[in-house]
Amino acid sequence: MGQKINPLGFRLGTTQGHHSLWFTQAKNYSEGLQEDQQIRNCIKNYVQKNTKISSGVEGIARIEIQKRIDLIQVIIFMGFPKPLLENQPRGIEELQTNLQKKCNSVNRKFNIAITKIAKPYGNPNILAEYIAGQLKNRVSFRKAMKKAIELTEQANTKGIQVQIAGRIDGKEIARVEWIRRGRVPLQTIRAKIDYCSYTVRTIYGVLGIKIWIFIDEE
């Protein structure tokens, strides 16, 4: 039953850390969560509009948010930050202004930092975006999956499982196709597994992409 639970939540506190660090009163908790979601959506939309990468991948691995009384620190982990950093500091200033307008935070300042991750294709979010781009360009799903696995092998991962569900190749009946390389021990809590669930809209309908990457064992 290891696949039934979210692998990130299952390992929280052992091999996985929190992506949002802040505390508030219980009555304001839902507002804080909504604000986090707004910040993440705003950053993703900005990156989508302002970066044109040949592979069609935005390259955001994760966004970490730390909140203090007068400051919101946002760290964007990216696989390909070059297009965004070329506009620096104008690009980051523009993003800070957008976030302040979106969140109506007059009393709080935004501090945005961009960090490049060493092996972009060892991250499931970037890999899922790559597969989504291939599927939109009508590349065969098997070819897209195999190419994605080849890219992760270059990142020295110990195992990967890719699953695509929906009306694959425009077939009438929805089905689930998956492929696995190496070990993916979903039951082992000390196994560091990175996971991503991604939705892609194609001309035939919506497809769901799930990726599990086994990085290391602690």
From Swiss-Prot:
GO process annotations (BP): translation
A matching Pfam family: Ribosomal_S3_C
Subunit organization: Part of the 30S ribosomal subunit.
Protein name: Small ribosomal subunit protein uS3c
NCBIfam families: rpsC_bact
Superkingdom of origin: Eukaryota
Keyword Chloroplast: yes
Intracellular or extracellular location(s): Plastid, Chloroplast
Alphabetical list of HAMAP family matching this protein: Ribosomal_uS3_B
Predominant location: plastid
Family: Belongs to the universal ribosomal protein uS3 family.
GO CC terms: chloroplast; cytosolic small ribosomal subunit
Keyword list, A-Z: Chloroplast, Plastid, Ribonucleoprotein, Ribosomal protein, RNA-binding, rRNA-binding
Gene Ontology molecular-function annotations: rRNA binding; structural constituent of ribosome
Domain called KH type-2: residue spans: 43-118
